Amino acid sequence: MEIPGKCTSEEIRLTLTSSFMMGNHCFILLIIISSVFLTVFAIRKLWKNNIFPNCTRTLLFSAIINGVVHHWSIAGIRIRTVYRALVYGSDRCSILFQSSECLIESNLYYYTNLFSSLCCISLFFDRLLSLNAKTSYNTKHFSKIFLLFQSISPFGILYWIFYDSVYTGFVPMCSYPPATSSLKFHKVNEFRLYILGTFFVLSFVIFFYNRTQEKGIIHNVYDTESRYKSYENLLATRAVCIIIATQITCLVTTASTTEILSAYKSSIPNTILLPSIAFMTGLTYSNFFLPIIIIYQTNRIINQRYNAIKRIQNEKSFATHFASLDLSWKSSKIDNSS
């Protein structure tokens, strides 16, 4: 939403200084502050408990760090908006931001958005390659490729979106793109949702395939190491599926709600429309849930791995016990015959 002139309407000025909008800023900042504490616990969990495969673990660290940077950019944008509303709230010609004032925050905000989605794609291919245990996949080589992919690709996408942008317009918040780039920006967002939706479905296909494969190994393979690796892959794939599902759910829900609100904007006053749309920050919620998922899945995997190891050990003891009984029965039979 870009406004061509420096001075906005009285309705938008009242909206930007309304208690509804201020409550929105406080809510988002509260989400960010809570996420900081959760992120600290999630990093400790990942660092101390080496329960994920090395490449998956590296990608999860990159996702957490990106989430922190994204929240910093959002916090900066929101705090600047609150400050502008408090200081220039009575002047409708000073309350807006010129797009050129938002270059750092907005580009950081868009970069972390794209990085997060590309990280989900990297996690998907990480789990896909892990299906074949005979490959030399478990090396640092692949994690470097994934990190380069999700770190460099956003620069090319952002260049295509903004290379011909004009930053002379005015916006209510620095999270809004310039008007000259808004069409390409929305096209990229729409394409991103379709791509993530596709990988969302494919990730569950991998999970169910992994589950079927793991069940087959249980019944046909008696090597403890093979069975353990198969079970470890299954647990890691399930965690990745949940992370991808959470991001796509948050993004699709907020994007769909924004589209619905925009479709009825003629019948909704700006005092309700703009604050409602400001709540629709899908990646903020997704990055809030990410450390929660990592903490929960880490604890769950630790418990399930412990139970699985215990079960395998019991099975080995059970088999050893009956093997010894069979041996003693055969020896006693020989003694009796002699």
UniProtKB/Swiss-Prot annotation:
It is a multi-pass membrane protein. Keywords: Membrane, Transmembrane, Transmembrane helix. It is found in: Membrane. Its main location: membrane. GO terms for cellular component: membrane. GO terms for biological process: sensory perception of chemical stimulus. The chain crosses the membrane at residues 23-43, 59-79, 108-125, 142-162, 188-208, 240-260, 276-296. GO terms for molecular function: G protein-coupled receptor activity. InterPro entries: 7TM_GPCR_serpentine_rcpt_Sra (IPR000344). This is Serpentine receptor class alpha-31.
